Amino acid sequence: MSGGTPYIGSKISLISKAEIRYEGILYTIDTENSTVALAKVRSFGTEDRPTDRPIPPRDEIFEYIIFRGSDIKDLTVCEPPKPQCSLPQDPAIVQSSLGSSSASSFQSVSSYGPFGRMPAYSQFNTGPLVGPQFGAVGVGSSLTSFGAETTSSTSLPPSSAVGTSFTQEARTLKTQSSQGQSSSPLDSLRKSPNIEQAVQTAAAPHAPSTATVGRRSPVLSRPVPSSIQKTAESPEQRKGELHKMQRPDIDQLKNDKNDPSKRQPVLSALQPRRGRGGNRGGRGRFGVRRDGPMKFEKDFDFESANAQFNKEEIDREFHNKLKIKDDKPEKPVNGEDKTDSVVDTQNSEGNAEEEEVLAGGVCYYDKTKSFFDNISCDDNRDRRQTWAEERRINVETFGLPLRSNRGRGGFRGRGGGMGFRGGRGRGGERRGAPGGGGFGPARGFRGGFRGGRGGREFADYEYRKDNKVAA
């Protein structure tokens, strides 16, 4: 097949590698996916061709079949595309369609659905002036024509509402589809001014579909609801009301802030003015405006402020807090316990008496002797803790260890640590003693040491006071 001959719309006889012959109208050739699409396809079977699986012919006519190019054995052209009979350019013609008897002209293409990128074939759709699938204007709902992709102007019978420019646009679309291009036909149709005029002259029932062709329908300017206008104007109005507040109102608020009876009405009067939109859609803040930094009429009097504090009393309370009471119980002072008098820092008389009581106590910290104190030392005896006591403390602190009868023993090698071995409890070697001796009942002999039969882990032994480590 030479590239110059227009085969789109031709009747094609195709033989697959399975020796099955098909006849149909060549619809498109996809060079990217290496596929050939035929429309109105009929299968004639194997027709006595040598094959392992003979297939009889079928009478059904398939709407379309897409063939893989690598599985096509032979492809021949039976009939060239037939030219179409064009209508005269009559201004009175708005829409036209041919009868079903001339089914060989294959005039229209209605949708892009079945083939994905490729338009699906359909015959003589009698749709409205504006196509419902993608809003293109033409005879029926056609966008391209199977017939006569030749140099002559026999592509589509043009209607007077569209004019000769639509014929050129249709020929452009046919060329794009025959070359396998994926550009949308709407882009080229929207560039034609005659199509826009045809859309404008369409009938009223077709008005909903004209919005997708050419110029878009203008957006209706709906009146803005009054509630939205009020919402938009309310921040500006509130700002104006706040700026209209006179200075005497603020001064009156400052003068009456100590009077609860006068303060509440003023605040309640200011809050509705502030409303809920105090800070750009926020929930509002307190109704008083910020008038800048605070102004002082005179300098701060440090002497009068210091006169309110008794330094000696503060120092005495501070020293009383630092002192530690003696362990010996003492009699209550003035009917109060000494602990209460130490904690109570507001009673200066009680603190003074506490100072006298604690003065003769034991000194727990002397910086001249050592940096550390002797408060946290619970036992002054210098002794070494025994193994039994250490284990008892560990059990009281951390609880009993979990017993595990699995795996190898935790103590291997020479010495063995706590691995009580053999008859005499000698611990330690990798050659386990033949005996299953040890402390406690003989149970769970898991071979804790390699090669040993009586080995047990340390956690398997129950604690007994008479247990002693073998030397």
UniProtKB/Swiss-Prot annotation:
Annotated segments matching region Disordered? 146-165, 171-190, 197-292, 323-354, 404-456
Q: Where is the composition biased (Gly residues)?
A: 412-422, 433-452
Q: Where is this motif: FFD box?
A: 363-379
What GO biological process terms are annotated to this protein in UniProt? negative regulation of translation; P-body assembly; stress granule assembly
Entry-linked InterPro entries: DFDF (IPR025762), FDF_dom (IPR019050), FFD_box (IPR025761), Lsm14-like_N (IPR025609), LSM_dom_sf (IPR010920), Sm (IPR047575), TFG_box (IPR025768)
Q: Which UniProt keywords apply?
A: Cytoplasm, Developmental protein, Phosphoprotein, Repressor, Ribonucleoprotein, Translation regulation
Compartment(s) of residence: Cytoplasm; Cytoplasm, P-body; Cytoplasm, Stress granule
User: Which Pfam families does the UniProt entry name for this protein?
Assistant: FDF, LSM14
Record-annotated Sm domain positions: 1-81
Gene Ontology cellular component list = cytoplasm; cytoplasmic stress granule; P-body; protein-containing complex; ribonucleoprotein complex
Basic residues biased stretches: 273-287
Domain of life here? Eukaryota
- Where would I find the DFDF domain in this sequence? 288-324
What function does the entry list? RNA-binding component of messenger ribonucleoprotein complexes (mRNPs), storage particles that mask maternal mRNAs from the translational apparatus during oocyte maturation. Acts as a repressor of mRNA translation. Probably involved in the storage of translationally inactive mRNAs in the cytoplasm in order to prevent their degradation.
Spell out the protein name for this chain: Protein LSM14 homolog A-A
In the UniProt record, the gene name given for this protein reads lsm14a-a
